[in-house]
Amino acid sequence: MEKIRIKLQAYDHRVLDKAVSIITDAIKRTGAEVKGPIPLPTKIRRYTVLRSPHINKDSREQFEIRIHRRIVDVVNASPETVDQLMKLELAPEVDVEVRALS
């Protein structure tokens, strides 16, 4: 295996940064090279709802949710690196996607 791309996303950037540091430490222990973490643009989803269930169209409330994303590239990955990545315990709030690149 030559290169692995790890995409992470979470609603809380502190939890995401902690997960990235855990991953990079595990990769560095195996001797592989780490590129990143590369911060990607934060997606902001906004929702506007009426406060009243019946009337008062002018009275509205707005909510937003922010999705923070990071990319970590692993160069010169060995089977030991993959084993270490599979054994990691990350926070359940963090969505992790792992892809093998050529």
Swiss-Prot record:
GO biological process, one term: translation
GO CC terms in record: ribonucleoprotein complex; ribosome
Pfam families named in the record: Ribosomal_S10 (PF00338)
Keywords annotated in UniProt: Ribonucleoprotein, Ribosomal protein
Highest taxon in the source lineage: Bacteria
GO molecular function: structural constituent of ribosome; tRNA binding
UniProt entry tagged with the keyword Ribosomal protein: yes
Subunit (UniProt): Part of the 30S ribosomal subunit.
Family recorded in the similarity comment: Belongs to the universal ribosomal protein uS10 family.
Function: Involved in the binding of tRNA to the ribosomes.
Protein name per the record: Small ribosomal subunit protein uS10
